[in-house]
Amino acid sequence: MKRKFSLLLAMIATLAVNAQNPQKGDYGYLYCHMSDKGQWTAYAVSRDGYHYEDILGGGPIMDPKEHARIEGGQRDAFICRSWDGKGYVMVTTDMNNSMTKALGKQSEWDNYGIDLLKSDDLIHWTSVSFDYRKGTEIFSNPNDKSVYKEWSTINRVWAPQIFWDPD
């Protein structure tokens, strides 16, 4: 894993050194997505927003089993800067449809949670998984009256897009 992160850092450094930036300051686009090679989050980079190249050959930027604690797969990744601009927040759907039988799911598209991740450097992540089958205990105030009666019936949870609104 250290080798992958070293390679990622080397690739990013190479891009920064070789780029002939016509603008002052940093620019470019980072796209986080589910890799077509597996059910994990991968990065791709672009200078123009149209042409992207996978980093690490589309390999995982983190261990999905460490951060997707419900099913061990990550889909629908969305990333943004943290509210203070000093880090990053990512949300992913915790789903691995190749585990349908092993997990006893009725459908390969059933899933039960989302993962919220935080990083200071886009490489090292901490995370928490929200398993909706556990009901209100996953929320910040589990004693509030629930508007939903039967949490165990929830079987299609998808990661939302996220943003910070300072107002």
Can you name each region flagged by the protein language model?
Residues 19-167:
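Carbohydrate-active catalytic/glycan-binding domains of CAZyme proteins
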Residues 2-9:
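Sec-dependent signal peptide recognition
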Residues 10-18:
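Hydrophobic h-region of N-terminal signal peptides that target proteins for export
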